[in-house]
Amino acid sequence: MSSSIRASRQRAAAAVVLTAVLAGCAGSAPAAQTAQSPGPAAASESGRAAESASLIRPGERHFSEVRQLTFEGNNAEAYFSSDGTRLIFQRQVDTESDCDQQYIINVDGTGLHRVSNGQGRTSCGYFYDDDRRIVYSSTHEHAPSCPAPPDHSQGYVWPLGHFEIYTANTDGTDLRQLTDNGAYNAEATLSPDGKRLIFTSTRNGDIELYTMNVDGSDVRRVTKRVGYDGGAFFSPDGSRIVWRAGYPETAADTADYQRLLAGRLVRPSRMEIWVANADGSEPRQVTDMGGANFAPFFHPDGERIVFASNHENPRGRNFDLYLIGVDGNGLERITYDDDFDAFPMFSPDGKRLVWASNRNAASPGETNIFIADWVE
């Protein structure tokens, strides 16, 4: 592979990380809103799931029967429905939208259709209410066009855009706004009992985790340490949470963090994985690896965490998947591709893993959704 192509793919991988983890979600009094159905999007890959041993790299012993579900554009953050039959994910394809939108697809690759309204940028889709509704974040209330890219003269930074959290039926109808405070409200996921959302917000001047009821009421702050807390998920029994965190370690780090935050930016180059009780008590650091460790998700056994990391080359964009015990022991590398693998999620029964990867791209920089049968 030429250096120019590799550089292009690495830049695209960075762009996926940038857009995929940014979303909108916050909680105060819910504001109801009704929108027209976006209707299904024509998708050339619908029903074309690829299955091949060539999708498995040497060393990927936990994977069997890997299937590629999308075949163009940038696709990321695919999350299972509670019955394991569907996925919701964000997708940006030039022929369909200038910005990431939310799509649903069956796990066999059929039935791809858009469920967001096609405006603004969306992120962090999740099923709830027995898979009859979805929750996701969007910037469309602030502006229907794509948000401007961040100021990279500041280095590699993520923008903390004007995202709010919404719910809708799985066909995109009955859109309801849950948050409305002008802050960054995003990265929302659901408790196993379906009653609480956990999300990231800047509403109180820092980037913290909060929970709220699924109707937007009873907002409670979960984290209180200065720094970036985000991308949280509940454990299978709902008693714990796992998230990524980047905490300033020096006075200079804190000053840089606060300066960027004032401009609605954050630098994600150093993040580690943390766990705590669901109310935020007894927080504990799981990883101490350096680099960017993010996108953690509990294994269904509740004792292990899968996540993405570039700790073997912190200045690079080659992220791989890793598995680690909640006690910080037993680190194991899962993927061995030479580009980008991230955003892993286990199916509810633990038999499948879905993730986003640059592997098998038809053109440089494509990121697609893959699903594998999981082998212990």
PLM-predicted stretches and their roles:
Residues 82-83, 129-130, 192-193, 236-237, ...:
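Residue-level detector of Asp-centered blade-edge/turn motifs that repeat once per structural unit
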Residues 39-64, 163:
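Blade/loop signatures of beta-propeller domains
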Residues 26-28:
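Bacterial signal peptide processing site
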Residues 106-110, 169-173, 213-217, 277-281, ...:
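Short loop/turn segments that connect beta-strands within beta-propeller blades
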